[in-house]
């Protein structure tokens, strides 16, 4: 009872808020950026003090009117005015408390750390020999991972990695003062927005009009009937699309053994806007082993190399054909004489090598014998030529 009396006395001392204060608080409530979180089991909206000060400095009360001074000229004047709003319980100060892990989880982590430290000491000696192999494998994995990430980024509709945010909770602060900075303040004042008021009024009018459907004219009834049928067909088509895309995914998944994940209209049932639910048209993800990816890449590189080699071979063939047309038969005529000369020179070199294998005296004796044989051979050849010459002469005389 005593606390209630004190609270009533404080309210009487502070007084009720004026129209100007309500207008400023309403403007701040709907224009200052806010966030929602849980506090003491309730869902609340909170804002940051520095953003509230910036918002009020950009408002109409920061500009001087004719014959009147501006309400907000500096940041200090805004802070003083917000202190008045805080005392009149438009909002109150809160304290951010980061969520800590439970003691059981901490003990489990400590026990795991001790067990892992003992195992690591035993494995250190083995790891030193395997470090070189691991470094090579890691480099290859990094390259493959970069390629996969680049491919995923190029494909539209792929979900991006979510950044992990630290969780916190709000608690009421003991010192209820407005300070310009990163302080957190929770809204108590929650007026009805003009848009919500208009939407509620339209909804009430629509319900009353629906109850008066028998009194509508015939043209309006037919029009509403066709509109309702069209809306029902549209909803049914979306449901059929959702079922068909699941069936298509299952068929591709079964045929490829779970390696290819193909989704048609992936955002159709997602919590997005109407237009965003139909974009992108499809998404494709490959979740098979990396060996298949490497094989595909190797096959592509081989195909490229084959195509390059075929192009080179075609160009070389053309050059050879052009070279063959120019020289003609001149090369064939000179080739026969060169072959004969090469065989004679080879024979002479073989004879010289055989003769040089013996001593010096043997070489002299062999040369003399060869000279005698050569002279005898020359004489015999001369006699044969003379005999050949005489035979045609005798034939001519007989004729």
UniProtKB/Swiss-Prot annotation:
It is found in: Endoplasmic reticulum membrane. The keyword Transport applies. Its main location: endoplasmic reticulum. Disulfide bonds: none annotated. Residues 218-234 are lumenal. The modification Phosphothreonine is found at residues 158, 375. It is a multi-pass membrane protein. Residues 108-167, 289-399 are annotated as: Disordered. Residues 325-335 have a biased composition (Gly residues). GO terms for biological process: cotranslational protein targeting to membrane; post-translational protein targeting to endoplasmic reticulum membrane; post-translational protein targeting to membrane, translocation. GO terms for molecular function: signaling receptor activity. Residues 1-196, 256-399 are cytoplasmic. Keywords: Endoplasmic reticulum, Membrane, Phosphoprotein, Protein transport, Translocation, Transmembrane, Transmembrane helix, Transport. Residues 108-155, 289-324, 336-354, 390-399 have a biased composition (Basic and acidic residues). Residues 372-389 have a biased composition (Acidic residues). The modification Phosphoserine is found at residues 335, 341, 353, 356. InterPro entries: Sec62. GO terms for cellular component: endoplasmic reticulum; endoplasmic reticulum membrane; membrane; rough endoplasmic reticulum. The chain crosses the membrane at residues 197-217, 235-255. Mediates post-translational transport of precursor polypeptides across endoplasmic reticulum (ER). Proposed to act as a targeting receptor for small presecretory proteins containing short and apolar signal peptides. Targets and properly positions newly synthesized presecretory proteins into the SEC61 channel-forming translocon complex, triggering channel opening for polypeptide translocation to the ER lumen. The ER translocon complex that consists of channel-forming core components SEC61A1, SEC61B and SEC61G and different auxiliary components such as SEC62 and SEC63. Interacts with SEC61B. Belongs to the SEC62 family. This is Translocation protein SEC62. It comes from Homo sapiens (Human). The gene is SEC62.
């Amino acid at each position: 009872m005593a606390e209630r009396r004190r609270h009533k006395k404080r309210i009487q001392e502070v007084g009720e808020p004026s129209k100007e204060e309500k207008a400023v608080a309403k403007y701040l409530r709907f224009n200052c950026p806010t966030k929602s979180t849980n506090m003491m089991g309730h869902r609340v909206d909170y804002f940051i003090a520095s953003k509230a000060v910036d918002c009020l400095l950009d408002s109409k009360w920061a500009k001087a009117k004719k014959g009147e001074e501006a309400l907000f000229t500096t940041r200090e004047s805004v802070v003083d005015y917000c202190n008045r709003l805080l005392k009149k319980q438009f909002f109150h100060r809160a304290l951010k408390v980061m969520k800590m892990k439970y003691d059981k989880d901490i003990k489990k982590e400590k026990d795991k750390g001790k067990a892992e430290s003992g195992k690591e000491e035993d494995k250190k000696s083995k790891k030193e020999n395997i470090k070189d192999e691991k470094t090579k494998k890691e480099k290859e994995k990094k390259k493959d991972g970069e390629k996969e990430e680049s491919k995923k980024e190029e494909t539209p509709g792929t979900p991006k990695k979510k950044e992990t945010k630290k969780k916190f909770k709000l608690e009421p602060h003991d010192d209820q003062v407005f300070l310009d900075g990163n302080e957190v303040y929770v809204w108590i004042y929650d007026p009805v927005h003009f848009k919500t008021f208009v939407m509620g009024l339209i909804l009430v009018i629509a319900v009353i009009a629906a109850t008066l459907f028998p009194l509508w004219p015939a043209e309006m009834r037919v029009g509403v009937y066709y509109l309702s049928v069209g809306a029902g067909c549209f909803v049914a088509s979306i449901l059929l699309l959702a079922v068909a895309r699941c069936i298509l995914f299952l068929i591709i998944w079964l045929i490829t053994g779970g390696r290819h994940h193909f989704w048609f209209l992936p955002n159709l049932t997602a919590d997005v806007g109407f237009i965003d639910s139909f974009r992108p048209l499809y998404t494709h993800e490959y979740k098979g082993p990396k060996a298949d990816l490497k094989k595909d890449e190797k096959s592509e590189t081989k195909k490229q190399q084959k195509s390059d080699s075929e192009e080179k071979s075609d160009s070389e063939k053309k050059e050879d054909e052009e070279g063959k047309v120019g020289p003609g038969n001149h090369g064939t005529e000179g080739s026969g004489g060169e072959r004969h000369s090469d065989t004679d020179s080879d024979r002479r070199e073989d004879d010289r090598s055989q003769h040089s294998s013996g001593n010096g005296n043997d070489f002299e004796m062999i040369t003399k014998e060869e000279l005698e044989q050569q002279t005898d051979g020359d004489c015999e050849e001369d006699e044969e030529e003379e005999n050949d010459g005489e035979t045609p002469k005798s034939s001519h005389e007989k004729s």
